[in-house]
Amino acid sequence: MLPSHLNGHSPLARRRPRLSAASPPATGDSDAAAAAADAPLAEHDRIYFQSYSHIGIHEAMIKDRVRTDAYRSAIMHHQKFIEGKVVMDVGCGTGILSVFCARAGAKCVYAVEASEMATQAREIVKANNLDDKVVVVHGRVEDVEVEDKVDVIISEWMGYMLLYESMLPSVLFARDKWLKPGGLILPSHATLFMAPITNSERYEGSVDFWSDVYGINMSALVPLAKKFTSEEPSIEIIGGENVLSWPFVVKHIDCYTFKAEELKSITTKYKVSSMMLAPIHGFGLWFEVEFNGPSNPTDKSPSDLNPLDVIRTKRRRGSEDPVVLSTAPEDEPTHWHQTILYFPDPIEVKQDQIIEGSVKVSQSEENPRFLNIQLDCTM
């Protein structure tokens, strides 16, 4: 059993904030907006939202062309549905997605943001002459009161390994409270993948490095290096060549039907076969999201399909297929990178050797925005 934990002291504390409050132009309910902004916050929420007041986080996200282009393409893909409709952007940040929706013809966009970036979002909306369509309200989506129902909910809620930050419950809250029947959620579906990986270069650079440093034997630090390498997940970029097997699905989320309670604990059993002779250094996690309409009850989720079929389907997508944003190792890198769970020591595996076990991802009791990961692996 190889336990790992995601916590606030790791590199994972880098991604962004959201949630908020909004009010349509028709209501002008400034009292509701003020109440939402003044609602008391738990300490972990306060720190979380405060971190997203820093421009650097928003710069990294917007400069991620894979991410930003995918959202813009998805909005244009669904333009006929968005045009003339009411949209809610949950966690709007700088307001870029709200502006995209307004330019696509939305009648009204509620741009909801809990961090202080809401102030700049208002200025951006005004500078683009969209303040008659986009209303930015500063507060958590859970605290705002909006009388009207919305036709579309859009949000860039994904964190490292999809679920870090636990912003998805806020999107689901907005869905249950405001989305009209038959409404659109962007993204509509999300899938977390996992696979064993090999990465000798990284291991040698972090662990074996200490055996000989400028001719000095510093191998006494090797056990410490192994401890720090394996006790927390690492956020880094790997390539398709580092992946030892077809990935398996840890969790598939249909944003139209998923319940927030399901995030408290997710356990998945796996059984994969190594595609090569190589040392296994740990496991990698990544995700993809799809911008589709409501699910067809007869459709299969990725967890019901062979991973090879999922990948082949993705590569065959045409112009009429839903937009997909992928953070897989074989695809163009994004600011999410991949999340790696390293072992203290590599284990040699043969080609076609079976690797099996289970993985449990659960919310931290101390802070539900953080994750605990427990990995069981047998070879």
UniProtKB/Swiss-Prot annotation:
Disulfide bonds: none annotated. Residues 1-35 are annotated as: Disordered. It comes from the Eukaryota. Its EC number is 2.1.1.-. Residues 19-35 have a biased composition (Low complexity). SUPFAM superfamilies: S-adenosyl-L-methionine-dependent methyltransferases. Belongs to the class I-like SAM-binding methyltransferase superfamily. Protein arginine N-methyltransferase family. PRMT6 subfamily. PANTHER family: PROTEIN ARGININE N-METHYLTRANSFERASE, PROTEIN ARGININE N-METHYLTRANSFERASE 6.1-RELATED. This is Probable protein arginine N-methyltransferase 6.1. It comes from Oryza sativa subsp. indica (Rice).
